[in-house]
Amino acid sequence: MKNLSKDFGVEINNFDCSKEINNDEVEFLRNTMQNKHFICFKNQNLDGNNLAQFTKNFGDLETYPEKDKTKGKLEIFNVSNVSEDGEHLSPNDQRVILQKNNSRWHTDSSYRYYPSIFSILYGQETLPEEAKGGQTEFSNMLLAYEDLPDDKKILLEPLHQVHSYNDIRR
């Protein structure tokens, strides 16, 4: 296991997410997520079935009624500019528009009554590291808050934030 930064994220090598994992491994991964908030597993070869099976180790999965879910897998939300039949989607396609909105800062499923504990992303096809675009970034909002000066925390204490699914569709 390699730290990706001092306080946030680890890379775990030689771990096959397509294989069944035991309770000790589940507990180790759950604890690592809770302490480091982000795990990167490189060089995975997953299909919809074993991706869903791996994620079910951590709890019930959300389902997605939207038309851009992965074919036959209600629990896998497909983020792509390519349709199921391999055609590039038009810039005016509703799925492309929604994904452009997701390119802004957001927290997955924060608008749900019971928000997700984890989000698991699997890149089937990604750009080379030197390419522009396609970079997903992660942040540790707990650490960001802890690092605030006390006067800022006092200012934020009485405030409430609303995360709305409808707002991202504007």
Predicted segments, located by residue:
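Non-heme Fe(II) oxygenase catalytic core, chiefly the N-lobe of the double-stranded beta-helix
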Residues: 1-170
